[in-house]
């Protein structure tokens, strides 16, 4: 039995070896999807069973496909077709995670077809239960802390105190809607990688998705190799509709998981480029704001960001997104102004701090979390307020240097707070 999802995770060299063992003829110029297609077709044609899975994307015609995270949810030749009848029978929606038995395409068909579904959203068909739709769930303030301070000695340097600073200045909770406001070369990508690592180490129960929109290909590779979680991307050389399609599938998948009481974190880099993509694909309304932004363009990216919430009786969706400023583009400034105030946590990076090579380049006085008293115990909260009063009289660079020096001589934040007593 061959599993389509497992084949997609293999390298081309491994696939060619499997093809050789099964007697599948392949030349050296075939794409990875073509090799997988011929492998699956060979197994099914010989009477073997094949299993396929992926995330449902329903098209406007009523039928749909199972898209693969390995292909960044883009349309490819090894996608699995789902008929409109099956979609109605199982009440499938875009974002559902489906696995089941598939058959090879006939002469007039182009895709594998789902024959029998085995599980939907990791639940066996026999155990499927009713669930409340995402829009009907009750949102609450974040109550459970996402601790970022990581004591993993293998991968975290003692001199790296970025996560400890965020835990003090702008603590995160499950269901947070956080915005990292960053000028160019201020270290936002490194901070995102460290947040992803801390979540995977400290909170293995959280489903982590890193969504990269409009990034450079080498940064995507670096993120894939440094993050233990799902990393999907649409690079800067891809058209705007691809950015939009990827973002829509990711947010719908996250919603389906939250409906099943899972805790999901999406790290989005960046919401500015996502808003630019929406601006390029939506039909023109005739009303254009400053910088060339259509008045209706920001509604859908706002809906994406606004989906982050803590859910009553279990489940949460946390979105930590970066917003670009000081890029020289008027459009980026307008987009940032529209998103400013929509989150309940802001981490502001300062170019003046990064220019002096002081990291993390966080502006302590401007960064913070709403309702932080629900995440931090009262004793630590009083010390955080005392620290803020002390740092408020300093400039942004001096405040960060002062806090950095104090954190470097302590092992963790608890020791730092104990030191404040003395």
Swiss-Prot record:
Enzyme Commission (EC) number: 3.6.4.-
Alphabetical list of CDD domains matching this protein: Rho_CSD, rho_factor_C
Keyword annotations of the record: ATP-binding, Helicase, Hydrolase, Nucleotide-binding, RNA-binding, Transcription, Transcription regulation, Transcription termination
Highest rank taxon of the organism: Bacteria
SMART domains: AAA, CSP, Rho_N
Protein's GO biological process: DNA-templated transcription termination
GO MF term set: ATP binding; ATP hydrolysis activity; ATP-dependent activity, acting on RNA; helicase activity; RNA binding
The protein, known as: Transcription termination factor Rho 1
Organism field: Ehrlichia chaffeensis (strain ATCC CRL-10679 / Arkansas)
Gene name of the record: rho1
């Amino acid at each position: 039995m061959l599993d389509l999802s497992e084949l997609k995770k293999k390298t081309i060299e491994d696939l060619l070896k499997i093809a050789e063992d099964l007697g599948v003829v392949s030349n050296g110029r075939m794409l990875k999807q073509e090799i997988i297609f011929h492998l699956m077709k060979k197994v099914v044609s010989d009477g073997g069973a094949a299993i396929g899975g992926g995330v449902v994307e329903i098209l406007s015609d009523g039928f749909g496909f199972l898209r693969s995270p390995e292909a960044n949810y883009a349309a490819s030749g090894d996608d699995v077709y789902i008929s409109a009848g099956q979609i109605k029978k199982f009440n499938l929606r875009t974002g559902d995670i489906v696995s089941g038995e598939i058959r090879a395409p006939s002469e007039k068909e182009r895709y594998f077809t789902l024959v029998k579904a085995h599980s939907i959203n990791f639940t066996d068909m026999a155990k499927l239960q009713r669930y409340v739709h995402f829009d009907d769930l009750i949102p609450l303030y974040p109550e459970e802390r996402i601790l970022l301070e990581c004591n993993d000695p293998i991968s975290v340097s003692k001199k790296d105190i970025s996560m400890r600073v965020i835990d003090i200045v702008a603590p995160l909770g499950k269901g947070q809607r956080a915005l990292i406001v960053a000028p160019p070369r201020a270290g936002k990508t490194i901070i995102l990688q460290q947040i992803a690592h801390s979540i995977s180490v400290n909170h293995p129960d959280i489903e982590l998705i890193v969504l990269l929109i409009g990034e450079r290909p080498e940064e995507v590779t670096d993120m894939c190799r440094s993050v233990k979680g799902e990393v999907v991307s649409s690079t800067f050389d891809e058209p705007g509709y691809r950015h939009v399609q990827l973002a829509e599938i990711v947010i719908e998948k996250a919603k389906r998981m939250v409906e099943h009481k899972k805790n999901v974190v999406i790290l989005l880099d960046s919401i500015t480029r996502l808003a630019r993509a929406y601006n390029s694909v939506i039909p023109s309304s005739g009303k254009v704001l400053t910088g060339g932004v259509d008045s209706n363009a920001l509604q859908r990216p706002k809906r994406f960001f606004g989906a982050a919430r803590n859910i009553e009786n279990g489940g949460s969706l946390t979105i930590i997104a970066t917003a670009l400023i000081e890029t020289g583009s008027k459009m980026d400034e307008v987009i940032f102004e529209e998103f400013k105030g929509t989150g309940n946590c802001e981490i502001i990076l300062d170019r003046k701090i990064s220019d002096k090579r002081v990291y993390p380049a966080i502006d302590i006085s401007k960064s913070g979390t709403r309702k932080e008293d629900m995440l931090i115990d009262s004793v630590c909260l009083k010390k955080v307020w005392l620290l803020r009063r002390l740092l408020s009289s300093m400039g942004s660079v001096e405040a960060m240097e002062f806090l950095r020096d104090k954190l470097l001589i302590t092992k963790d934040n608890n020791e730092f707070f104990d030191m404040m007593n003395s």
